Amino acid sequence: MAERGGERGVERGGERGDFGRGFGGRGGRGDRGGRGRGGRGGRRGGRASEEEKWVPVTKLGRLVAAGHIKQIEQIYLHSLPVKEYQIIDMLIGPTLKDEVMKIMPVQKQTRAGQRTRFKAFVVVGDGNGHVGLGVKCSKEVATAIRGAIILAKLSVVPVRRGYWGNKIGKPHTVPCKVTGKCGSVTVRMVPAPRGSGIVAARVPKKVLQFAGIDDVFTSSRGSTKTLGNFVKATFDCLQKTYGFLTPEFWKETRFSRSPYQEHTDFLASKALSTSKPDPVVEDQA
């Protein structure tokens, strides 16, 4: 009986291969993987390297790639729209961090039944006055997170920081009382003395840390259990820090030329080089 059992085990492993319980079949799968998957791995690596090469499409992207725009403040000064997330990667660099705040399933009722997708909330920031929020819905979790990160980079805004009392050291808190709202959620921020820390719930605290604010008092009301509205209200609050002018900004404004006007020759030459030349027609006379 023992011999029969051994023979059956060998037969199962040899005949069924991948689906058998015998170890012989699994070993065969390993050999096959060594043959086929090794080549695939090389190809995948090549594709990734190709994707890393950024070819700018917009005028702003071409100026950033060429090094004519070196600071993100130049973009904010002229209110230029950012359409490529690689611009943020080049200007802010490795200091930009991201965190997934929440992934929630959402459903839509169709004739065939309920269609389930996943919604991701992602916050990005460098901890030095720049923060962004991205929301993306997709069939797969990984795709939703990847899309939310890209949207968060495209929505990066400057955050104005100030002092609670005397202007000693670096700015550490919000410049004044500011309120943000989304849905039923209202978030209010009040300047705090140095050393107070961020007095806030878990959700707005993470956003404020990414924005580079060290001390602030916060109060919130409404349905703060709805994390999406809570994050959006906090982000709206930080956006409004540059929404008005305080006395130190009442000085006469010095107008400067837009980067598009300064580097007109570069953009024109770039456009001419990318365009195809007209074919030369020879005379048959």
Swiss-Prot record:
Residues 35-46 have a biased composition (Basic residues). Residues 1-51 are annotated as: Disordered. The keyword Lipid metabolism does not apply. Residues 96-159 form the S5 DRBM domain. It comes from the Eukaryota. Coiled coil: none annotated. One of its GO terms (biological process) is translation. Residues 1-19 have a biased composition (Basic and acidic residues). Component of the ribosome, a large ribonucleoprotein complex responsible for the synthesis of proteins in the cell. The small ribosomal subunit (SSU) binds messenger RNAs (mRNAs) and translates the encoded message by selecting cognate aminoacyl-transfer RNA (tRNA) molecules. The large subunit (LSU) contains the ribosomal catalytic site termed the peptidyl transferase center (PTC), which catalyzes the formation of peptide bonds, thereby polymerizing the amino acids delivered by tRNAs into a polypeptide chain. Interacts with MBD6. Belongs to the universal ribosomal protein uS5 family. This is Small ribosomal subunit protein uS5x. It comes from Arabidopsis thaliana (Mouse-ear cress).
